């Protein structure tokens, strides 16, 4: 069996590692460096440069030098509008509202650009090993959604790699950190702030098991954003002095970016740095120079919003894991941006202890990926990695409610099925609306896919049984299947790369879910009550029709009166009136049921009201057919 390499496909830099003699080795590239800039350049004559050669020529070729492409992976064009405005290269709206990089009229997908970086990493490994490499473990941010994971897998395939596993970056880092400590019981927090993304994961380690308890983060918070606060400050200062916005010139913008990144790095070890850019731009025919001093204090002031944005995800992750900061034994720093002193200070403040500096933040993720590769080949034994899915998943059901099938922070791989039914007689088709998020109502969550199940046999409402199955594999990629149990017909969907969530949407969902939890609960209870009334009306009318004149006249009149009252309350959607009418109807039905029971005789097994007679005692009664207590009433749309 060939080697499985581990690749950290980063926003700013990438790294490749391989297991040699049970030891992970970080492989040096052809330029003699252990990390490779995630930069691709297209130069005259059709030549393509990747890594350091591409980065070195960026100032003179800004519109054809592509960087931070990871931020575009699996996103729609609308979701990356902020990034489109920031970069000097041209990004246009492509098919299916996807972002495409325009190089002289040739449109490249983010997957294609990422594949070029992966090819560089593949070649680096092949040069070191002296053999062809065809398989890899590739890491992604823990908070990457299904579409972004799928896009990463596609990039690997384009690069000629069979992606054996997609692993979350903090989880890979924990594997590298804890492999030699696997006999100890530990609780660790992995704080991963890279070039473009931020993740926080809480894990338990012990007896070779690495179990993720919770994860949180922001897929658009990283070193790029820290660079941009410096860029904006430099540009605004220059504009106030010279009346010209340097951000409008691609070459000047590229010089600002490099200067900002250099200043940020220097301020991790010094209290101030001079930014000197001669001949930055001519103003009225006169060459102008940019010379400014940036102190660490000023930088921290400029970046304060970004620094504080790291706090809430950490607090949420601790809460979701059922832990307090005192429960955490070690805090591991991952990603180059964790070298910023203010970040280290905020981490210590959040967790109440100084973070461990025992791992290389630039290399530890790739090392963990290589170890996972060794687990897959059998070279590494007695290690079990248990990861989680970051967001809840479900479908839209009657009344616009999101019915969850898989909760956030569920260990993967996982599979969950539920039975649903129809709300219309003789409904031939249903539409399955797949949702992702934490809110109770469908409209407040993110729609990540829709598909139809056709060919349902004609039947009264609530009779068909549609089994919906959510299946998340070890890569965190979702498959949804709908199965009509009567006809055997099946339909499924794999969520495609353009349908995922943006970082802002994820953040908004969780914040709003917390702030509106009580309102959501009340609204859901209201909808549930209306649905119960609807089902009770249906079941009562069905029983009246089936039993006909078997009802004693003196018992039927109260039922008719209560039924009319319930219909009026249901039409008005008055919850209090519904409660009263349902209670009256249930009383009338019970009285009629007793009379029928006496008349028919228990021994004869006559027309007796079953346990669901007029049913509407709770969510599991009137909502469902009397012969199957596991069927949920769903307001599917009829597809004509």
From Swiss-Prot:
Q: Where is the composition biased (Basic and acidic residues)?
A: 626-640
- The keyword ATP-binding is assigned to this record: yes
Q: Compositional bias of type Gly residues: which residue ranges?
A: 603-617
- In this UniProt entry, the residues modified to Phosphothreonine are 197
Pfam families for the chain: HSP70 (PF00012)
InterPro entries registered for this protein in UniProt: ATPase_NBD, Chaperone_DnaK, Heat_shock_70_CS, HSP70_C_sf, HSP70_peptide-bd_sf, Hsp_70_fam
Q: Does the keyword Endoplasmic reticulum apply?
A: no
Q: Name one GO molecular function term.
A: ATP-dependent protein folding chaperone
Key words, A-Z: ATP-binding, Chaperone, Nucleotide-binding, Phosphoprotein, Stress response
Q: What drives induction of this protein's expression?
A: By stress conditions e.g. heat shock.
Signal sequence extent: none
Region Disordered: start-end pairs: 600-640
Family recorded in the similarity comment: Belongs to the heat shock protein 70 family.
Q: What does this protein do?
A: Acts as a chaperone.
Q: What is this protein called?
A: Chaperone protein DnaK
Biological source species: Porphyromonas gingivalis (strain ATCC BAA-308 / W83)
